[in-house]
Every structure is written in C-alpha cells, then in structure tokens.
C-alpha cells in the first residue's frame, strides 16, 4: 500500500477502505480524549445557522501550525471523512506511508509533470468522499499564528471543480498566561466561500486562483488575530525528518 514514485496518487480498493475504516475508528477513539488532555482542544463552527453542515463537496483549507493538525482537523469534520494532501516523501515511508494512504493521504509529487495526475486525484477525492484537505503553506510551521503565503494549487482545483472552499483555522493561545508553556488549541470551521468562475484560459484561471488564495488567507489571518492567537509560540519550521518530510 506504500506509495512509490510514479504510482497512482489514490488507492481505492476494498482492503484499503476496510483498513481506513479501522484506522479512522481508532484515531477517533483516542484522538479526542488525548487532544483534550494535551491541548484542551475546542472545535467550533462559525457559520450561519442555515449552513451548519459541511457542503456535500468542498476543498478544506487550513493553516499548518501543529504536527497533530491532521488529527485535529479530522476531528473537526468527523464523522465525515476527507482525503488530504501531504508530501510525497511521507507517503514513501515504509510504515507511515501505508498508514497515511489508508487514511486518505494523497501525495503531492514535486515534479511538475504530474499536475494532471494531482487534478485527477482531487476529482477522485471529491467524487468519493466529497472533501479534500489542503495545507497551502506547504509545510508545518510549529506554533505559527502569522500565516505564511498560500500556494494557489488548492484554489485552482476549487475553481476548476466549481466547489466551495471551507477554511478550517487553528488558533493557539497560552493556557495560563503569557509565561505558560502549555498550549490551548481552538479549531474553528468557517463558512464556505464560493470560488470565482474559471477564466477564459488557463492563465486567467491561475490569476483568479492567486487572488482567491490571498482572499482566503487574509480572512483566516483576521480570524486568528481577532481570536487572540499568540505568535510568541512560534518555533520555526518543523524539523526535517528523513523519510517523513525530507
């Protein structure tokens, strides 16, 4: 089940679905109590009353500031399941690669020659689970509350697929005052944002994707700031671990 370079980006067999169901149940069983114990996690929804449920199809967008973000964000949409994108190197790891693939991981090849394959994988994810999750900063910046610029790929796929973007914001605060080292995590699901239509050609669509990414970025940053996100917690990019994120 481990991904190998050049292989299909999604795997949807009876065995992989069964293993995915087992792993999701296990993560749900231990993830919530563990997250509450370690981070006093709160999961909130900031939407109009008429749209409390997630859209049937959507691109999820998150800032990436904690190694456990995939667990937190999976809890935020549970019982819905989502495909999620991650580094190609992570999916190639012998054990971890198989686990994340069972859970719905879509590797993002560094080669620009596989852009069509990525678009096909996103379409597959939207057709089968309805949700595909992106971290458009490109990597994890531990403790960061000043979101780095977004890459436009996720927003391009939202425009091409005609599906809304749902921002899922991670807000970090110190639990007991500014001298505390303990972190309180709030995951807030914002209202869906309808993308602009496709442009007249690929270049025009890309330009719209960049503008759309900036719009969503600024909205998420404003949410962090008005909620008291504490950027003094920032510790820099997640260290490179060979076979995991390097």
Where are these regions (language model features)?
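Structured helix-beta-strand junction loops
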Residues: 37, 80, 102-103, 128-129, ...
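Non-catalytic C-terminal accessory region of glycerolipid acyltransferases
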Residues: 2-11, 15, 118-246
